[in-house]
């Protein structure tokens, strides 16, 4: 196995809601008020007056699919939308792929904010994580974006290396 050990970790859950657990120096962060890791209530990148969870949840996948496809989503589950993206079920494949990509982008924005405080490995799980092939591109794009100063100087939005460990070509 790999001898590298990590003492700091951000564990992300994508599913009914958007959650996180934070480990710093091998200790679970609970916070003084039991609020350690409350990523769900971070500012939403797209809808800045809403919480992040409105764009990073099962309901977000359904809402975005409905908006993009123009189809009724009352009886669709995220698994159904995943199956549409895969071509297993009929529906608007492009809207299905984009609904997961947008979830990834919005989750990525919140994860970037969290990583400014917690310099550690990110592990992602949860019920919606099964759609990783559609979520991770938007997430990685967001985490690799640049940000600038008024003078026009650009910086990577994260100062640490960002790689997807599911893609062997991305890490050494």
Give short role names for the model-derived ranges.
Residues 2-4, 43-172:
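ATP-binding/phosphotransfer module of carbohydrate and carboxylate kinases, centering on a glycine-rich
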